[in-house]
From Swiss-Prot:
Its main location: cytoplasm. This is Ribosome maturation factor RimM. GO terms for cellular component: cytoplasm; ribosome. PANTHER family: RIBOSOME MATURATION FACTOR RIMM. GO terms for molecular function: ribosome binding.
């Protein structure tokens, strides 16, 4: 079965079985909602078990979650450092124009048929996502995911077409 990272358990939260998660999910509210099915993977990336979310809330930069049948700190402390993943079957459907991060990462980025580089990661600093584009012989390019910049995303062909606004690429 194929799984995709959605977060890392960084610590416990209180004594009632809550965990502090650093999310890397494209849809955190959906991914960590009550009833969601996730999988726990240990620090060696080995599958441990399936878990069900029974509560979720945001606190600062973290998602605070609780699993079904794990209601005390003693039951969850061993999971610190573990990774939460969603199975491909539990990902859910997307609206047109929406993408999963794993679909975008690795895509080739072009401006007017000139290869700029490849998307290596996606940041969520605020109002919009920022795609980090790895370029050959240059510093990484921070590409805001906004309509005037990202013109098209072709998932089947792993291609993104962009128009770089003035000042966006300080190495040109």
């Amino acid at each position: 079965m194929e799984y995709f990272n959605v977060g890392k358990i960084v610590n416990t939260q209180g004594l009632q079985g809550e965990m502090r998660v650093l999310s890397v999910s494209d849809f955190a509210e959906e991914r960590f909602k009550k009833g969601s099915q996730l999988a726990l993977f240990d620090d060696k990336d080995q599958f441990v078990q399936e878990v069900t979310i029974v509560s979720h809330r945001k606190q600062k930069n973290f998602d605070i979650i609780k699993f079904k049948d794990m209601y005390h700190i003693n039951a969850i402390e061993k999971y610190k450092g573990y990774t939460l993943k969603v199975s491909k079957a539990n990902q859910g459907d997307l609206q047109e124009g929406e993408f999963y991060y794993h679909q975008i990462i690795g895509m080739a980025v072009y401006e007017k048929d000139r290869l700029i580089g490849y998307v290596k990661e996606i940041l969520q600093p605020g109002a919009n996502d920022v795609w980090v584009v790895k370029r050959q012989g240059k510093r990484d390019l921070l590409l805001p995911y906004i309509p005037p910049v990202v013109l098209s995303v072709d998932v089947p062909n792993k291609r993104v077409d962009v128009e770089l606004m003035e000042g966006l690429d300080d190495e040109d």
